[in-house]
Amino acid sequence: MNPLIIKLGGVLLDSEEALERLFTALVAYRQEHQRPLVIVHGGGCLVDELMKKLSLPVVKKNGLRVTPADQIDIITGALAGSANKTLLSWAKKHDINAVGLCLGDGDSTTVTQLDESLGFVGKAEAGSPALLNTLLSAGYLPVVSSIGITAQGDLMNVNADQAATALAQTLGADLILLSDVSGILDGKGQRIAEMTAEKAEQLIAQGIITDGMIVKVNAALDAARALGRPVDIASWRHAEQLPALFSGVAIGTRILA
């Protein structure tokens, strides 16, 4: 069975209650299914908190964090360090054998600078599946942070939705993007069950989909096109529905290729 990549985002990493719900759902799913799982995460909320403590500015451009040279080491520490190891500690509490990685490990993705005006922000593309396949076949749960490394050895902050997309391409995996919201909402605040590229463009033009959600929707559309299969955007808040989601039941918005 092809692997399933679960991308974690939003305030989930900052909430013990949310992490307890998520890992309880993961344990329940793993007990019933032999499907290999990979977790991909960012940690924007943790980075924002750290920047505030250090009195450093937080600048975002089109939903992407501007990452100057004097901030990339701090962001790497927050994402590949604190956020990643927090998730490993929760896995350990739930007797899940996890391995903490970044996008650069085993050349699992190829990362290049996205746009000079954004600083050390990278774009990830599919790389080698060898390391991840070795870990998955041995029963490990890879937990991958969205820090990448270029061919020149530069650390890059990669949008976690886009990072998860690249890893899904690497592994030929299905992809679920978990966030704070229950899916994509229309102008009346109602969840949209299915979304096409045409519908997304229409809602962006109308100003209904904005900022970080534009990045998320575009990443999901890119993934759906690249993988040739739907991608789900859903909330981690409904823990009782997560095992069904992991089994292919749409509980949020299903992005169609």
UniProtKB/Swiss-Prot annotation:
The gene is argB. Homodimer. It is found in: Cytoplasm. Its main location: cytoplasm. It comes from Pectobacterium atrosepticum (strain SCRI 1043 / ATCC BAA-672) (Erwinia carotovora subsp. atroseptica). The keyword Phosphoprotein does not apply. ATP binds at residues 180-185, 208-210. Pathway: Amino-acid biosynthesis; L-arginine biosynthesis; N(2)-acetyl-L-ornithine from L-glutamate: step 2/4. It comes from the Bacteria. It catalyses: N-acetyl-L-glutamate + ATP = N-acetyl-L-glutamyl 5-phosphate + ADP. HAMAP family: ArgB. InterPro entries: AceGlu_kinase-like_sf, AcgluKinase_fam, ArgB, Asp/Glu/Uridylate_kinase, NAGK-NC. GO terms for cellular component: cytoplasm. Substrate binds at residues 43-44, 65, 157. It holds the Pfam family AA_kinase. GO terms for biological process: arginine biosynthetic process via ornithine; L-arginine biosynthetic process. Belongs to the acetylglutamate kinase family. ArgB subfamily. The record marks 7, 216 as: Transition state stabilizer. Keywords: Amino-acid biosynthesis, Arginine biosynthesis, ATP-binding, Cytoplasm, Kinase, Nucleotide-binding, Transferase. One of its GO terms (molecular function) is acetylglutamate kinase activity. Coiled coil: none annotated. Catalyzes the ATP-dependent phosphorylation of N-acetyl-L-glutamate. Its EC number is 2.7.2.8. This is Acetylglutamate kinase. Transmembrane segments: none annotated. NCBIfam families: argB.
